[in-house]
Amino acid sequence: MTETESAILAHARRCAPAESCGFVVRTPEGERYFPCVNISGEPEEYFRMSPEDWLRAEMQGEIVALVHSHPGGLPWLSETDRRLQVQSDLPWWLVCRGAIHKFRCVPHLSGRRFEHGVTDCYTLFRDAYHLAGIEMPDFHRGDDWWRHGQNLYLDNLEATGLYQVPLSAAQPGDVLLCCFGSSVPNHAAIYCGDSELLHHIPEQLSKRERYTDKWQRRTHSLWRHWAWHASAFTGIYNDLAAASTFE
């Protein structure tokens, strides 16, 4: 554990049951934690930083992360957290249950423009799992890889911690592999429950839609991560709600 991380955890303990808040700042001497005062009217439920604290942190160096805590709460960013994180364009570090959970500032899961290898179906799957607290590796994928003898999903899923489950056992957070104009599975979607999926197909924005007969016919298999648990979908749901509210 770094000195910065130790300082973050100590500050969170001192502030509890109120939420702590602060910044990780990169200075010429290295990264350091810059604690702030939570000026929220409901500090046990929310945090708010003063503009003066933000300015003082910026004067110390480059802000590389915003930090706050969820005392007695959940280890995922809330709906409000996600909305504010995207606006801040910063990584957010969340202290919960004595640990620091670090979240990259990924775009909202719905409403993304498609760009193969940058914001595509795998990016959406990877970012959704990141918000749920599970890290998936990124990897190079050339255009139309499925037309050039590659089978990237089936060749990599087990090695990254997923295992196949029966379609009849689908749970929110499971990954649907589909054959989209291909004889091999070349498309991933997140099953959201209630016959709904979240995915990103070419020439469309990422979105939720019904898991209709059309997509059921295209489905190759269903996969689940060994570290997945039902409550992890909270991190995904909070982002979807934040994007809906923002729109």
Identify the residue ranges that each predicted region occupies.
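Active-site nucleophilic cysteine motif
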Residues: 115-132
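Extended, compositionally biased flexible segments
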Residues: 58-74, 205-206, 210-221
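Surface-exposed patches in mature extracellular/periplasmic domains of secreted proteins
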Residues: 136-141
